[in-house]
Amino acid sequence: MVNVTIYDEAPQLKPNEVPQNMAAGADTQLEHMCRLQFDSPVPHVRLSGIVCTIGPASSSVEMLEKMMATGMNIARMNFSHGSHEYHAATVANVRQAVKNYSAKLGYEHPVAIALDTKGPEIRTGLIGGSGTAEIELKKGEKIKLTTNKEFLEKGSLEIVYVDYENIVNVVKPGNRVFVDDGLISLIVREVGKDSLTCEVENGGSLGSRKGVNLPGVPVDLPAVSEKDKSDLLFGVEQEVDMIFASFIRNAAALTEIRKVLGEKGKNIKIISKIENQQGMHNLDEIIEAGDGIMVARGDLGIEIPAEKVFLAQKAMIARCNKAGKPVICATQMLESMVKKPRPTRAEISDVANAVLDGADCVMLSGETAKGEYPLECVLTMAKTCKEAEAALWHQNLFNDLVRGAGTIDASHAAAIAAVEAATKAKASAIVVITTSGKSAFQVSKYRPRCPIIAVTRFAQTARQAHLYRGLVPLIYKEPGLGDWLKDVDVRVQFGLQVGKKNGFIKTGDSVVVVTGWKQGSGFTNTIRIVTVE
């Protein structure tokens, strides 16, 4: 996904020069890295998508418009917080902001809306009958975790309620229990009929309704909670574009979500959030069954050792790249910017390395939901993505992806040919005329250096295209012409006009055009290289 924003200036390049030109033609990974230049011109267009979580700091129409102008592509609603009424107002504001921003651009600018489910989770009960009371746990002390509902609102230094009734059957002595995002750790010493006797390993202040993690323990929580079902049906009513499904452990969970979405929600994309060891072990079946993956590093960093999260991230992204499924990298990417206007150098490297790993999108959470500098966060992320995209060794990645493609159909072969043609011709863009989006998504898989302009008449297809690296989705609203070839040509011209208007296509540039030989989805097999007039 891409769009050109108010901050994207055309780079000053010589004829046939590309950003990081010296590195682009390297023969080895080491040589490629040696040739990277810190003062290379920045690409004109960002190819990675930016997901922004909408909250109190960003939910106004005015702020949403500014975020779109700065680079937001997908608006995420976190259903761990807020009522349906609150989220309905957010959806309405996003759509109003899209209308306002589109009017300024002179064409419809698609922005996707994502519903992030709360998911099945384990939580503690109330401390001392209050939502605000806390207890101080100290290292070496003993505390009981109980499933006895008598203690639901009577948590104390001696005993605290947890809402997972089967915990005594899955946890063994020696297992660790993490509470409150891993800030407090307990070691299980004894397992009783309805309680665990634990020793405090790392103490701290424990409040009410805090999350509980059981790293390495195969839990049997329902894939979709009653709250999730209600939220999913709300999402169908609101016509959201995608679901970010929390704590997905296997492919069966996706089948259950699909059943809840029903016929009316059959076209909603499901992005599986991998947040525990079970999800990692079943990753291949989850990728195959779903529409994409989110590397949800928050809970994942509690469920597995923190020093192994980068391995999980690289494995998830690579497998998604190989399968041609979109992948989002999330959690604490610019965390310090919740309070500060500038990121740490480590955070910039984190964003850049997610792009270099192959992520299609990067995500902001609290940074835009509750932070003091939401616009600065989006701009920082957008600028970092562009630098990283230019530094990627595209030719090597393309060759690896082609080698792993196996036997392919005609439209898939056309996608590979289009990317190779664009590279050889130094094309400014690839224009794809698409109905379902499939042909554009296939081109995206092979990671061209240039933007992919995906022209479609279907608004939801355009919005969902933001999940994929490199796509500039455009909605063509004019009715179809009787002559198929003329109808294709006017849509191609529309794509070229938008590219010229945004400055990344110029007169005399080469552009690769990918179309179908007849009307409908699944007939894409024609490639042309045209010179822009």
From Swiss-Prot:
Pfam families in the record: PK, PK_C
Keyword Kinase in the entry? The reply is yes
Q: In which tissues is it expressed?
A: In adults expressed predominantly in the thorax.
Q: Which residues bind ATP?
A: N78, F79, S80, H81, R123, K210
A GO molecular function term, named singly, is:
magnesium ion binding
Gene3D superfamilies in the cross-refs: Phosphoenolpyruvate-binding domains (3.20.20.60), PK beta-barrel domain-like (2.40.33.10), Pyruvate kinase, C-terminal domain (3.40.1380.20)
Identify which cofactors the protein needs according to its UniProt entry: Mg(2+); K(+)
**A Gene Ontology CC term for this entry?**
mitochondrion
Any one of the GO BP annotations: canonical glycolysis
Q: Does the keyword Glycoprotein apply?
A: no
Arranged from A to Z, the UniProt key words for this protein are: ATP-binding, Glycolysis, Kinase, Magnesium, Metal-binding, Nucleotide-binding, Potassium, Pyruvate, Transferase
Q: Enumerate the residues binding substrate.
A: R76, G298, D299, T331
Known catalytic reactions: pyruvate + ATP = phosphoenolpyruvate + ADP + H(+)
Task: Indicate the annotated site residue(s) for Transition state stabilizer.
Answer: K273
Residues engaged in binding Mg(2+): E275, D299
Give residues annotated as binding K(+).
Answer: N78, S80, D116, T117
Disulfide cysteine pairs (residue numbers):
none
Q: In which pathway does it act?
A: Carbohydrate degradation; glycolysis; pyruvate from D-glyceraldehyde 3-phosphate: step 5/5
Q: Which family does it belong to?
A: Belongs to the pyruvate kinase family.
Q: How does it assemble?
A: Homotetramer.
Entry-linked NCBIfam families: PRK05826.1 (NF004491), PRK06354.1 (NF004978), pyruv_kin (TIGR01064)
Put simply, this protein is called Pyruvate kinase
